[in-house]
Amino acid sequence: MAVPFLQDHDTKHDLLTMSHLSLEEIEHILHDAQQFENGALWSPEEKLFVANLFFEPSTRTRVSFEVAEQRLGLHVVNVDGERSSVQKGETLYDTAKTLESIGVNALVIRHRQDRYFEELKDRINIPIINAGDGCGHHPTQSLLDLWTIQQEFGRFSNLITVISGDLRHSRVARSNAETLTRLGARVYISGPREWMEGYEGVYPYVTMDEAVELADVIMLLRVQHERHDGTVSFTQASYHEQFGLTVKREARMKPKSIVMHPAPVNRNVEIASELVECPRSRIFKQMKNGVAIRMAVLKRALTDE
């Protein structure tokens, strides 16, 4: 039976940053994700292997990719970066080239180095899917966020999205701010001003008290203590009071506005614990959507038509 998927036509379908995708390609991926959600089937005609290389801790992204791969009938090879030959001095390139030589058909990589993929993209002949690079980019998270917003509102044009929190260290913020702007949304930023480097002057700044009355979508970000080298000047309580989504602030949001968060969530820091699963929260919906989005991305990577 024919499956109603749209087809791409490149020969090597890397997914490194959202800026590498045209708006048409984004539309194709969201379309294919919806087809998978609706029960459509796709699997490769031959046995294909996908290697997951994670050099940073991950729960949602790693498991979501593995579930997506298995649902597509792919053979999954999980490589623990902390136990790989990289710990013996092997370069990331040599590790990737080794897996390509062994017969792996695509690589899913998360790495702590910003833009790690620059040394790989023109030298590795199999598709590379970026599962997060340092403070740089997280394209599959951005795609699942876009799909979640599209499901909710059916549009991006003039939609007001406030991205709030640790923007300086967030690969999610960068991917989403750039792409939502390309799609016609109105993006605002919020949070501690010292964490707005690279954003302030590009996107308008609002306080959280202003954001809750303005936004259609509030996208909260975790305070990434591991990237601050112990320099965070806020206590959890003071951050929550000044910059977090408190119960009182949530009550002032527009009736149809939603709350998003890429997780992991620091309860009672960026968001009150009782709001994590409140009616306007889409946090666990985002996680659910990650599987179909990653199925669509894997299909794109492994399709030669």
From Swiss-Prot:
Keywords: Pyrimidine biosynthesis, Transferase. The keyword Transferase applies. GO terms for biological process: 'de novo' pyrimidine nucleobase biosynthetic process; 'de novo' UMP biosynthetic process; amino acid metabolic process. One of its GO terms (molecular function) is aspartate carbamoyltransferase activity. Pathway: Pyrimidine metabolism; UMP biosynthesis via de novo pathway; (S)-dihydroorotate from bicarbonate: step 2/3. Carbamoyl phosphate binds at R60, T61, R110, H138, Q141, A263, P264. Its EC number is 2.1.3.2. It is an enzyme of class 2 (transferase). GO terms for cellular component: cytosol. L-aspartate binds at K88, R171, R222. It catalyses: carbamoyl phosphate + L-aspartate = N-carbamoyl-L-aspartate + phosphate + H(+). It comes from the Bacteria. InterPro entries: Asp/Orn_carbamoyltranf_P-bd, Asp/Orn_carbamoylTrfase, Asp/Orn_carbamoylTrfase_sf, Asp_carbamoyltransf, Asp_carbamoyltransf_Asp/Orn-bd. Heterododecamer (2C3:3R2) of six catalytic PyrB chains organized as two trimers (C3), and six regulatory PyrI chains organized as three dimers (R2). Catalyzes the condensation of carbamoyl phosphate and aspartate to form carbamoyl aspartate and inorganic phosphate, the committed step in the de novo pyrimidine nucleotide biosynthesis pathway. Belongs to the aspartate/ornithine carbamoyltransferase superfamily. ATCase family. This is Aspartate carbamoyltransferase catalytic subunit. The gene is pyrB.
